């Protein structure tokens, strides 16, 4: 009897040990899978994983710049060169160019919307400057432009010097005002400025003669020129456009830059520029 009891006791002990080991192994496997999953997400970048979890890339674009980012009044859709460019980034991250959410921005609102996380990136005629690089990651440039001047044909202006003492309409928080102030100082002339919240407002001010000139990057002006206005030949302060993202979203910035450079190398960027008639 004692021998039987001893055998049963030993058997139970072995079962308990086996169960314990099995449980421990299962937990270890589960923990290993968990760790592996976390390591994978970490390797990819938490910022990219966050976009994948949302299932959509949120992008700030212009809605008042024909050819770049413009809300089509007939369809209600936002379309343009920078919209198409952003779709390629969505495709790279999410595998589908349509997994994109577009948010209209202006020169004044694009920074704050990026700062508070309402959008993941900005593709909105955003000029790269050393000062802005302190606040945001910028991709390599995808387009180079310069400040142009749109005036009424009947005004007779042919150069910036002709606008001495006149009022220039510019967008709020843009680099245009500073560029023209520096050029005016170089030429020994004086300019006055009136700032507006959107480009259509500046064009309306030009048409109603509240300003004498509409100044912004020349490629943007191309979308506003009409039979009664003309863009002067001179260009000031050559500047480059880049896609901006938050400084701590380093993996996103890396992916954005890869797409931009791949498109430049393959010729796709030039095809997009040609498609939208950007000069």
Regions inferred by a protein language model and the residue ranges of each:
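C-terminal motif of bacterial Sec signal peptides marking the signal peptidase cleavage site
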Residues: 17-20
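Extracytoplasmic small-molecule ligand-binding "clamshell" domains
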Residues: 32-34, 38-45, 49-122
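Acidic, polar ligand-binding/catalytic clefts
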Residues: 87, 99-161, 229-230, 235
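Periplasmic-binding protein-like
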Residues: 63, 143-151, 218-261, 279
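Ligand-binding cleft/hinge of the Venus flytrap
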Residues: 74-75, 87-98, 176-195, 278
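A ligand-binding cleft/hinge motif common to bilobed small-molecule-binding domains
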Residues: 109, 125-135, 179-184, 203-238
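Short loop->beta-strand "edge-of-pocket" segments that line small-molecule binding or catalytic clefts
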Residues: 57-61, 79, 161-176
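Extended ligand-binding regions for polar small-molecule ligands
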Residues: 22, 32, 39-41, 83-85, ...
């Amino acid at each position: 009897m004692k021998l039987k009891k001893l055998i049963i006791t030993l058997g139970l002990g072995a079962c308990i040990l086996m169960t314990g080991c099995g449980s421990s192994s299962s937990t270890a496997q589960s923990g290993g899978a968990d760790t592996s999953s976390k390591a994978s997400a970490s390797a990819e970048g938490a910022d990219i994983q966050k976009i994948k979890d949302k299932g959509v890339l949120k992008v700030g674009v212009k809605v008042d710049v024909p050819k770049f980012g413009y809300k089509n009044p007939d369809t209600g859709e936002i379309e343009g060169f920078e919209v198409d460019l952003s779709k390629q980034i969505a495709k790279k991250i999410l595998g589908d160019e349509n997994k994109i959410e577009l948010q209209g921005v202006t020169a004044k609102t694009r920074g704050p919307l990026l700062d508070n996380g309402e959008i993941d990136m900005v593709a909105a005629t955003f000029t790269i400057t050393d000062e802005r690089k302190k606040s945001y990651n910028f991709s390599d440039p995808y387009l180079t432009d310069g400040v142009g001047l749109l005036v009424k044909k009947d005004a007779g202006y042919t150069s910036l010097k002709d606008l001495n003492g006149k009022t220039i309409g510019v967008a709020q928080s843009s680099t245009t005002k500073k560029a023209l102030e520096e050029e005016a100082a170089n030429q020994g002339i004086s300019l006055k400025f009136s700032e507006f919240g959107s480009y259509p407002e500046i064009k309306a001010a030009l048409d109603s003669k509240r300003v004498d000139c509409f100044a912004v990057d020349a490629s943007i002006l191309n979308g506003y020129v009409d039979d009664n206005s003309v863009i002067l030949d001179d260009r000031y302060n050559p500047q480059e456009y880049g896609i901006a993202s938050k400084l701590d979203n380093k993996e996103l910035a890396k992916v954005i830059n890869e797409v931009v450079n791949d498109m430049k190398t393959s010729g796709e960027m030039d095809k997009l520029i040609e498609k939208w008639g950007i000069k």
